[in-house]
Curated annotation (Swiss-Prot):
The modification N6-acetyllysine is found at residue 229. It comes from Mus musculus (Mouse). PANTHER family: ANAPHASE-PROMOTING COMPLEX SUBUNIT 7 (PTHR12558:SF36), CELL DIVISION CYCLE 16,23,27 (PTHR12558). V-shaped homodimer. The mammalian APC/C is composed at least of 14 distinct subunits ANAPC1, ANAPC2, CDC27/APC3, ANAPC4, ANAPC5, CDC16/APC6, ANAPC7, CDC23/APC8, ANAPC10, ANAPC11, CDC26/APC12, ANAPC13, ANAPC15 and ANAPC16 that assemble into a complex of at least 19 chains with a combined molecular mass of around 1.2 MDa; APC/C interacts with FZR1 and FBXO5. TPR repeats lie at residues 101-134, 169-202, 203-236, 237-270, 339-372, 373-406, 407-439, 442-474, 475-508, 509-531. Residues 528-549 have a biased composition (Acidic residues). Disruption phenotype: Mice lacking Anapc7 show growth delay around weaning, although birth weight and adult size are normal. They show sensorimotor dysfunction in locomotive assays, as well as defects in the regulation of short- and long-term memory retrieval of the contextual fear response. Loss of the protein does not alter the anatomy of brain regions. One of its GO terms (cellular component) is nucleoplasm. Keywords: Acetylation, Cell cycle, Cell division, Cytoplasm, Cytoskeleton, Mitosis, Nucleus, Repeat, TPR repeat, Ubl conjugation pathway. This is Anaphase-promoting complex subunit 7. One of its GO terms (biological process) is anaphase-promoting complex-dependent catabolic process. Belongs to the APC7 family. The lineage of its organism: Eukaryota, Metazoa, Chordata, Craniata, Vertebrata.
């Protein structure tokens, strides 16, 4: 048994640190005496040494050693006869089982992706002839092409993966995300569905995610619910996570939180989707829950973007925007495709007044998730913050046409129309349409209330808000109702509404300001009663508090968010 065989056995046993030390010494010996090992043996040493470096995450060093190994392999292929080794008395047949050159190139590409050098990774994998590409090589190529915006070769590579592995579900999702029709994708899996038992759900699964990637949230929800109700797929964490995300996109925060909680109970180590869950909790003012969630996720893994995003949400809603910016940047560093991280960083930049930088991040989020409305909302808010109403209007109209006329797109367009006095009536019409579709949609209710406040139609606003609060409890709605009640001199109930708002979100500054303002004032009834008491006591002193007409508390702009639902 040769020394190379020992190195190979240690590598197979996972003794990477041992392989690294021994192979380093043997390579130095080979450099000092080129006759010590044959070309094939040196090739093996270089590959095993590079593998150990890869395991230690020294990717640049590993790439250089893989490149040297490939050069050695070229020299080996030109050598018709293996030179005898002076360092080993015999060469077993096992020692001639050389590491695959294709596998070396794949590992090399992996190093490049870890170093964020995607073009170099593509170049290495492109150098492998199509017929020699394994499914994992095609999968990596497909993902790299997709990331680079090269849709056609990406589709081709995904299809090649499915040709070899028809149950590669992530490849199916990749094709659907590139606008390949669900029927075409389903046809590529038909044979396996018909021949393998208990796979009748797969065609429905493909149909559901086809709806997801076309932005048809309601049909996607219904289809996944039908899957989730089947006994064999009940309580599947991935399906629950998808449902939670779809409810989030559809603006149904309540059901989204419920599904995230259900998935989390089934899998306490779940990370995927927890960034959205943390954002929803932060938006509801549940900052203590957000902090606990962040700590739990960091204990699971700090090498994923989600824990950093959750912690960033806590900072953002605590108005610590610089820290939120740092945490968002850290999340992007770990996963450049994290949409929620891009939205967090963009929102922090916007609130810090760095609008142009924020715009770049929101545009990247749109590129990665063209069906997510919150990405467009962040960009439109930046346009409005910089008084670029025309750009905001163009974007809102494009979203309306692309994603269809639903309550969310109607409200988004109305939000922009409210910024221009000329389009106030159009805003009113759009909001009425949105509320006709979803009477409890919070963003639409808030904007309609804003419009009624401008027109001083407080009674209409109170009726609107009471109706919206009939089946839900929302901090912003309770606070605005309190503002409207102050405007019609209903002080006691206004105080009650502010109290409810603060119970839902103790950090809601506007509710606190409204309550403090009321405490400093006194209603006319109380003032009269105080004067009567003074007269009865014959004090002759007049109350020093004058009754005043309280105007509606200025609730102004609705709260900042980096994902409007």
């Amino acid at each position: 048994m040769s020394v190379i065989d020992h190195v190979r056995d240690m590598a197979a046993a996972g003794l990477h640190s041992n392989v690294r030390l021994l192979s380093s010494l043997l390579l130095t010996m080979s450099n000092n005496n080129p006759e010590l090992f044959s070309p094939s043996q040196k090739y093996q040493l270089l590959v095993y040494h590079a593998d150990s470096l890869f395991h230690d995450k020294e990717y640049r060093n590993a790439v250089s050693k893989y490149a040297m190994a490939l050069q050695q392999k070229k020299a080996l292929s030109k050598t018709s006869k293996v030179r005898p080794s002076t360092g080993n008395s015999a060469s077993t047949p096992q020692s001639q089982c050389l590491p695959s050159e294709i596998e070396v190139k794949y590992k090399m590409a992996e190093c490049y992706t870890m170093l964020k050098l995607d073009k170099d990774a593509i170049a290495v994998l492109d150098g492998i002839p199509s017929r020699q590409r394994t499914p994992k090589i095609n999968m990596m190529l497909a993902n790299l092409y997709k990331k680079a915006g090269q849709e056609r070769p990406s589709v081709t590579s995904y299809k090649e993966v499915l040709r070899q592995c028809p149950l590669a579900l992530d490849a199916i999702l990749g094709l659907l995300s590139l606008s390949v029709k669900g029927a075409e994708v389903a046809s590529m899996t038909m044979n396996v569905i018909q021949t393998v038992p208990n796979l009748d759900w797969l065609s429905v699964w493909i149909k559901a995610y086809a709806f997801v990637h076309t932005g048809d949230n309601s049909r996607a929800i219904n289809t996944i619910c039908s899957l989730e109700k089947k006994s064999l797929l009940r309580d599947n964490v991935d399906l629950l996570g998808s449902l939670a995300d779809l409810y989030f996109r559809a603006g149904d925060s309540k059901n989204s939180v419920l599904k995230f909680e259900q998935a989390q109970m089934l899998d306490p180590y779940l990370i995927r989707g927890m960034d959205v869950y943390g954002y929803l909790l932060a938006r509801e003012g549940r900052l203590e829950d957000v902090e606990n969630l962040g700590c739990r996720l960091f204990n699971i893994s700090d090498q994923h973007a989600e824990p950093w995003v959750v912690s960033g949400c806590h900072s953002f809603y605590s108005k610590r925007y610089s820290r939120a910016l740092y945490l968002g940047a850290k999340a992007i560093q770990l996963n450049s495709n994290s949409v929620q991280a891009l939205l967090l960083k963009g929102a922090a930049l916007r609130n810090m007044g760095r609008v142009q930088e924020a715009i770049i991040h929101f545009r990247e989020a749109i590129r990665l998730a063209p069906c997510r409305l919150d990405c467009y909302e962040g960009l439109i808010e930046c346009y409005l913050a910089s008084n670029s109403i025309r750009e905001a209007m163009v974007m809102a109209n494009n979203v309306y046409k692309t994603l269809g006329a639903n309550a969310q797109t109607l409200t988004l367009l109305a939000t922009v129309c409210l910024e221009d006095p000329v389009t106030q009536e159009k805003a009113k019409t759009l909001l009425d349409k949105a509320l006709a579709q979803r009477p409890d949609y919070v963003k639409a209710v808030v904007k309609k209330a804003e419009l009624l406040s401008r027109e001083q139609k407080y009674e209409d606003g109170i009726a609107l808000l009471r109706n919206a609060l009939a089946n839900q409890s929302d901090c912003v709605l309770h606070r605005i109702l309190g503002d409207f009640l102050v405007a019609v001199n209903e002080y006691q109930e206004a105080m009650d509404q502010y109290s409810i708002a603060l119970s839902l979100d103790p950090n809601d500054q506007k509710s606190l300001e409204g309550m403090q303002k009321m405490e400093k004032e006194e209603s006319p009834t109380d003032a009269t009663q105080e004067e009567d008491v003074d007269d009865m006591e014959g004090s002759g002193e007049e109350g020093d508090l004058e009754g005043s007409d309280s105007e509606a508390a200025q609730w102004a702009d609705q709260e900042q968010w980096f994902g409007m639902q």
